[in-house]
Amino acid sequence: MSCLLHPNSGNLPLPLCLLAFGEKGLALAFPYFVIVSVSQNTFGYAMIAGNLKWKEFFFHPIVISVTAAFIVKITDLTVPNMLLNTTSYLGYTAIPLPLLLLGYALPQISAGNIKIGIVYALARLVFGGISGLCVIYVLGLTGMLAGVVMIMASMPVALLNFIIAAERNVEPNNIGGIVIVSSLAMVVLIPLLVWFVLWAFPV
């Protein structure tokens, strides 16, 4: 279920929103990214692992980070440049780590895992596109905001689902297959998605 509900909301859709709509589009995409990230790292974790303790919820790095950012924002605190640079470099260093983990697991993914991956990947992409259109229709969104929602909702299965599955040993090969297939499908679908968004939701 987490694979269907939690798409890739960071390293793929954010650059796409920047490409399609510029800095304003990227700014609109960030709140969506934060909400999905918090949900994925807490409720998504519980869906895959089967449980989530309240202590794990409140002390999860993403929850602490969002809370700290919110406090800084509302209080207008000035964060020292040294701290900003340190956290930025640590963040850049962490980007390839999930990809290395998935690459390590690739030899263990069988044809059966890929078949399951195809089914769930198609379900995620269809579910994401339809849910995005429903949100746009229900909320009456137009223009850039509608386009950003459509891009964010139509993304493939997030790699984090595989990381959680590998950590808790809950069908990691099946979930790895889902992540791989849905991500490869987006290589073909991204140009079509960007074209559709710019055509359907002109700024």
Model-predicted segments: where are they?
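Alpha-helical transmembrane segments of multi-pass small-molecule/ion transporters
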Residues: M1-V203
